[in-house]
């Protein structure tokens, strides 16, 4: 059996895997255990009561967290004319059409989010094999193919997170940094839960939000007591 590191032993001793923690208690514990030499992200895993094998039960979308994610986001936009100017004014780092596509084909991808106006998809469509595997392909379901590219840029900059369940029906995303105060992390989590509830498939049966766990980049998962989240109980 692999030998436990000192850090892993501390986590094992501090975290009760059988317990559901109040959100404030959970955040305090995560902060205590976040000893990496960088500011760790706070990640969430939400187990949904869906059958991920059925296409009509898959959950996908995006929402802007009230306090952002703490990340600096670089945005690339495929647009032309007035839309291109609007994207630049909104803060997009890269704006173009064929010229931007050529950069990407050369492997120049210094961006985190790609947004496209509908008329630009004829250009973006050529990049599916490059952007798709990296989770960067624009998609109308998450608001990254839109006639209002300026709003999409502002949302990306403001802390929008995209979510999509995996094959086990679990949503994985980030809700902030470990140096956020507890109330901001709680409000970000509640905002995500509200978005997930709104996205509930009509065919999903039984308990929808089955389990919520928080963890830091280098830490263990802590299960959350959902009764302490107003978004869940109201």
From Swiss-Prot:
GO MF: rRNA binding; structural constituent of ribosome; tRNA binding
Keyword match Electron transport: no
GO biological process, one term: regulation of translation
Pfam families referenced in this protein's UniProt entry, alphabetically: Ribosomal_L1
Keywords, ordered alphabetically: Repressor, Ribonucleoprotein, Ribosomal protein, RNA-binding, rRNA-binding, Translation regulation, tRNA-binding
Any Gene Ontology CC annotation: cytosolic large ribosomal subunit
Record bears the keyword rRNA-binding: yes
PROSITE patterns assigned: RIBOSOMAL_L1
Family the entry assigns: Belongs to the universal ribosomal protein uL1 family.
Quaternary structure (record): Part of the 50S ribosomal subunit.
Function according to Swiss-Prot or TrEMBL: Binds directly to 23S rRNA. The L1 stalk is quite mobile in the ribosome, and is involved in E site tRNA release. Protein L1 is also a translational repressor protein, it controls the translation of the L11 operon by binding to its mRNA.
Name by which UniProt lists this protein: Large ribosomal subunit protein uL1
Species in which this protein is naturally found: Yersinia enterocolitica serotype O:8 / biotype 1B (strain NCTC 13174 / 8081)
